[in-house]
């Protein structure tokens, strides 16, 4: 089964991907990992991508999608795969179809923006050991102090309120077009990501007709 996972930052997409990898025994493939592997393996597409990256430029769609097509043709993807980070645009989605990369289901994990803001802006990370906390879901015993090492808890730049709102705006601007595209193809399923991790995962498996 070939899947694409969509979800705003903080929606729990990474957690659901990990569960699906375990339950369906298929790999999750991220754009970043694919690029790193192609470059490390010295493939022709990898070498071309490295030239763009070394020059500080974005890797063109045709190279990204060529690397995707190569990766999903590998033996470990014969039983299916989960794509993460691609497609990001309508042009990439259309090119993926044109390249013959078969997608069975596109799962969109839906969480209200206000809830996502609460999830992300409430996160705290220890500046010393990297331990993670949340001011409501997983608070430290002493406010602002790491339980593990006593280090100071900080707010990452990515979790600052204005940054979170900007990231959500960008996500919606690009993803609504993708949802419309795959919805017209009859492949889009939407799952409530505000419920428990376990219930959301059950709903995903039911929506895609997976037997586990």
Short names for language-model regions:
Residues 1-212:
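Glycine-rich phosphate-binding loop of ATP-dependent small-molecule kinases
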